[in-house]
Amino acid sequence: MSVRGSLIPHIARAAGFVLLMLTLAASLCPPARAQVIGTQSAVGGVLVDADGMLTRATLDDLGKLEQARRELTDAIPEDLRQTNQLLKISLRGLDEAIARCRDRGEPLPAEILCLGGLQKIRYVFVYPDENDVVLAGPAEAWKVNRQGAIVGATTGRPVLLLDDLVTALRAANGSVRTVISCSIDPTADGLRRWASFRQGLRPGLDPQTVAMAMERQLGPQEISVTGVPESSHYARVMVAADYRMKSIGMGFEPAPIPGLPSAMDLVPSRSRAAANMPRWWLAPDYEPLLRDAEGLSWEIRGGSVKAMAESDFLDGAGSRRHSGKADPASQRWANLMTERYDDLALADPVFGQLRNCMDLAVASALIAKENLLEKAQVSLPMLMGSAGVQTASLPAPKQVASRAQVTRKNRAMVACGGVEINPWTIVEHAETSDALAAVRTEAALERPAGNWRD
């Protein structure tokens, strides 16, 4: 019998959307499945319907979440209720614990689904004598916040999820090393329609009228995902973060923190107009890794997110052209987004979830590039095998309605861009530190033998 640690949907109707409010539950049926708490249809404040259309979700009916909060909190083991500056997770032990649940026909417990409350991967240790690879970082007890995200009970920082770990490990160990990315962009047909339409616009039209016409002519924008399954929770986090970034940057929604205006607010009234297609994307921002001389101890440093900008323009034939640089307002906004990202990630958890996904991608790429599993002589059939844990399968995001905005120069604009995670360039750079060997030894002494976590 296979184990299915899944989440049973509770349907709540709010603002015209059918939202899937998922609570901790389990049912037994093949294939092996470990869908994670928090991988609901509405992720990061966006909803994707059966046709792949992405829309902004609202969570007015918070009463449905109250039961999930209670169940999730009650499921925390007593020894995980305290903040842990360095929680160690044995990948071998985790894989074996999942297999035991499968063999016994038991659901996966919340502590496995939430990876013990781990919030960041700071170290990766290899123990050849124990045939093990260990992930280590800060952790704390968790809760479900009002946005439906699983976050630390005291810090509010999102926790890492088993589902995303499995997705990242399998992506890094594929036959081809690919970049993980998502992009939301106008279609080529839509751009041609708009280019043809705007040639007939007469001067002096109301800018809002022009913006509405631009939205109609462009039609739905395409959503593309590479490197991970487009139906995965990992992919949904990327798309949701991209959508939220553009909503804030274009001024459709205010930032949930002070000091982050929209890019529209940064366009000087007397300056040249900004590009009609600003392109913003989010990327990892890491320092070079640290390693010991033997390559058995690794420290992942930095671990933040940066916003990048470039200005695109539409030529007369309706083709999008890259300028190779950003207009001043777009670049200034990207700089502010980067500076305020940590605060934004606390106020809007999807940005913290994206940072977690980047952490998992870097750790997984490191394990693959340095052959750490081979060094430890360990296999992880449940985490990495095709017959092991089956990750969440959500409606794949395919398109989203175009939204145009009017600048202070009365010019209609529409944003494009996405998320780009290239962990391979990050793990190519490492510096050697003799101090890491002692950290690895201490971590081994503190971790109880035979357990998947300390």
Regions found by a protein language model. Give the residues of each.
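Extended, solvent-exposed polar beta/coil surface segments
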Residues: M1, F17-L19, Q35
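Selective for proline/serine-rich intrinsically disordered segments
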Residues: R4-L7, L28-C29, A75, I421
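N-terminal secretory signal peptides that target proteins for export/translocation
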Residues: M1-R13
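Outer membrane pore-forming secretion/assembly proteins and partners of Gram-negative envelopes
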Residues: R33-D454
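Signal peptide processing junction and immediate N-terminal pro/mature segment
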Residues: A26-A34
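Bacterial N-terminal signal peptides
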Residues: A12-S27
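Polar low-complexity intrinsically disordered regions enriched in Ser/Thr and small residues
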Residues: I8, L19, G388-T391
